[in-house]
């Protein structure tokens, strides 16, 4: 029996060698392998093979899987791009490969039982949930935007409309963690690292449950504060995120690198418009112990980027535009040359992480789509890297998932689709990839996704909107999510966190750098000409013209 390849793909998903377009980004992926055996496929539904006596094993759930996602195309920095089934047990990825009943099929990796729930993944794409390491939690509604974009892990600062830039108070952290029990996202908080004494930093870690520090110029990014934060971080194995001294009052970029003295740091919005040494903080992008990241307002570089950032800077930094000094400080941070070079550095793998900077000059729900819009822009400018865009797509998915997890010590739990990790998975229709997820699974449980008219006869009746699923209600959000804390909080055992979440210690944050990131390990001498603004990498000029329009935008959003 033969079947038309398009008809086969419509029923069973694409085969090895088939190609998929990712939204309107211009990116095309090729399926590298297929775990299915043609002619003996696993498929759920009326008259299909996922039945007792056929491809479902009559066994207790504890001997099979709780949930299986069948025949989905995985895009993952670790797994590559391939069609597999994903077995989930007790909230974690249990098996990856061919699904079915080993009593009736050969080569089964994912045992599906008569008690297993099935998510039909045929025709869909699965990615690991995105990890956003730069979120100003000024509003609880940020979580709606984050979940609706495919973010399942947040490293945050603040606990509402307060001037925080890090949270140190055990009292405040107690209530902030408690508030998150209503949301199916993993959460970690950064303590404020801008202190010349270590006492409030240690207090934040051991008593409050913070998972790292934020050193910010608005609160002090001088020599003593930066060194203090790094010393405490080295002792407790947590990450330090840096928003460096944009006024160069105490330190230039060269001075900051000397203070680091080879110690690992995560340099936020490394392009500089979001803050940092003027005009050349981008020099830190090529340094072996500096993990650089971008925030999404400058991604990809577009025609309106320069104009829109002035008002954003004034607002979030409480500047007064009638004061000449304040206006000049804002304008000095906006440089078209570094914005254009930022896209190119991402494409070369010299910047390994993207994040939102939500409500601190970024948009919580746009990191995923802006990252892939940037990838599409770079393909349009520099051309495809081969017969398909697999390498480029994997490089960019790593910026959203495994690399931020590695930087903040979360990669033993999240960031990739691997056996043993939390089953934080996002399912996408290919035509909506990067823009709007179809379903967000938190620890394998439906948490957010497309929902239809609740009074309709089927769940696909319009209007279709993104909204909370059962994993976002009742006691479930806390039970399927974790709180990332410092090991000191677990060792001391005296934190006052009321959360029912499992506490997980961050680890492996020190002594790492770009070389430890996935698919984004380029280092080199990045220089910014202070007169012309031209950016070079190892002497080669980096330029990118502002885009007139970007993908994953107006086609999907009003």
From Swiss-Prot:
Cofactor info, note text:
Binds 2 nickel ions per subunit.
Show the GO MF annotations.
nickel cation binding; urease activity
The enzyme class is hydrolase
After translation, how is this protein modified? Carboxylation allows a single lysine to coordinate two nickel ions.
Q: Which GO terms describe its cellular component?
A: cytoplasm
Q: What processes does the entry annotate via GO biological process terms? A: urea catabolic process
Q: Which residues form the Urease domain?
A: 129-558
Its primary localisation, in coarse terms, equals cytoplasm
Keyword field: Cytoplasm, Hydrolase, Metal-binding, Nickel
- Membership in a protein family: Belongs to the metallo-dependent hydrolases superfamily. Urease alpha subunit family.
Record's NCBIfam families?
Answer: PRK13207.1 (NF009686)
Assembly and oligomerization: May form a heterohexamer of 3 UreC (alpha) and 3 UreAB (gamma/beta) subunits. May also form a heterotrimer of UreA (gamma), UreB (beta) and UreC (alpha) subunits. Three heterotrimers associate to form the active enzyme.
According to UniProt, the name of this protein is: Urease subunit alpha 2
Q: Which organism is it from?
A: Streptomyces coelicolor (strain ATCC BAA-471 / A3(2) / M145)
What broad taxonomic lineage does this protein's source fall under? Bacteria, Bacillati, Actinomycetota, Actinomycetes, Kitasatosporales
Gene from which this protein is expressed:
ureC2
